[in-house]
């Protein structure tokens, strides 16, 4: 029943909220299933320009300001005419990215079967006895993989808050960490000399989320393609942020394995691979080649560190 039909004074404020020019939805709070949040959005995105004085000068510095050729972070925040100054980035030799081309397509198998395949890769990589970080895009997949692993590990939602898990992982309490959310962009792992990283799925935003749907509508009205002008570039940005979690020092090494075979089989996958390869080595491998590729890179890193140590002693 529509609240405006009730006609009761105590519902007036709530009725005004629901009948105003907003899109709204109900969502459970993250920390408590008993709390319900009333979320709303009039424009589909946060317009920073509306909150600042007209004479305010703003400088934004980030590795991810440019989203695509037609959309930038400045555009989305209400600064369509903001100039972008780009700096050249040197290619990182201490990190390689492996794209697995024969992994089951995530859209062709059940969530359980996909989780089983992910768990099998984790078991194989765990044999190297190096810290292993697995970044998921959903809580459900994370927990499903966790339930399938016999190896000791730390899992978000099971073993504590992200900050606690990070500390335990860096102390060496467990060699496997399963995480999502803030682990993609808000956590740095700088203590380990080498880290293995696994990304089971490409980090696309859920197209059914209210804010995403609203933003897609606005981009279409502006004559832009929501997927190629925003969703795909944002997924690439999130991937770049994730890859940066494990190379925080010049002497730190990392191998990242992207299991989602859409990065190889789909047309847009070429754009992802080309973008990532500008800053690091990207290789396309079959699953049976993964072990030898990781072993070779590990050995090359050890050899480089030995040579560096010898030079420093001279």
Regions found by a protein language model. Give the residues of each.
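ASCE RecA-like P-loop NTPase motor cores
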Residues: 1-314
